[in-house]
Design a protein with these regions (language model features):
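FMN-binding flavodoxin-like domain, especially the glycine-rich phosphate-binding loop
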Residues: 1-143
């Protein structure tokens, strides 16, 4: 059934291979055996806004080393457009960066914008990968 399929919003996937290699690997493992559609063309957001309502969504955002992803800003602008484009949707996030910075700020910004657009984030919806992955050591120590 189309509405049961997980939609993965993967902006700016066309970045350098190095920038997206780790996130591609994570998604390949995480989505193994899951009926998912990866949306790489952010122009599709505007073309069929009804498509995302009531859906299961995964935002996969590669930030590179400078914390900038132009495609992500297209998603952010769409979410902030004032309509409930994600009404009834449930989401999660994977934010990856080649530096130790920007992942939490991006996740907060995305969570607020998506929530205002109608998307719920349940439990611990964020997987955050900094360059060194040291944040996983801290998380493991607190578990």
């Amino acid at each position: 059934m189309e509405n049961d399929r997980l939609l993965v919003l993967y902006p700016q996937k066309r970045g350098s291979e190095k920038e997206r290699a780790r996130l591609d690997e994570v998604l390949e493992a995480a989505l193994d055996g899951i009926d998912a559609e990866i949306v790489e063309n952010m122009d599709l957001l505007e073309q069929d806004p009804e498509r995302y309502r009531g859906r299961r969504l995964l935002f996969a955002v590669p930030l590179g080393k400078n914390g900038i992803n132009r495609g992500y800003y297209e998603v952010l602008a769409w979410l902030r457009g004032g309509e409930q484009v994600l009404s009834g949707a449930v989401g999660g996030m994977i934010i990856d960066a080649e530096s130790e910075f920007y992942t939490k700020a991006t996740a907060r910004e995305l969570a607020v914008a998506a929530n205002r657009a109608g998307c719920a984030f349940v439990g611990r919806p964020l997987v955050e990968g900094t360059a060194s992955l040291d944040n996983y050591l801290i998380q493991a120590a607190h578990s």
